[in-house]
Amino acid sequence: IPETYVKNDFVKLELCKRISLIKNEDEYNDIVDELIDRFGDIPDETMNLLDVALLRANANICFITRIWYKDGDLRFVMYNRADINVDGIDELVKSYSGRMKFVMGAKPEFILKLGREEKNDLLRKAEFVVADMSQMLIMTHSEEDSVDNKA
């Protein structure tokens, strides 16, 4: 959060803490609305912080423990005891037309080969994939059963 947007360090620290605790889209929207009401238009770097917090919350609900990019691949590491519909794995992989694969192991992961254009906006691509995972793997748990509470 830039100093030009929120000048008071204590307020900035409290906002960062609240952003890090975002658990769902409603909480995300509440903080966005509050920031606009209190401080005006939200700068890009603060929106990125908010977007990453929401992605992390959504990934947690899908039992994703890590999202990372390496050598043209966007990787989604799953909690090894994830309570997912395993029948949805094949559907998810097929929906990406040969660009996604699932690797079973101590840390199962989905690996998506990105095209040249997709590499320019990794955050948005990760958001789309997590949304697809949420739908196709048909989560059979509540938020209370997510990764944070299993670790």
PLM segments and residue spans:
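Accessory helical-bundle/CTD segments and flexible terminal tails appended to RecA-like ATPase motors
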Residues: 1-151
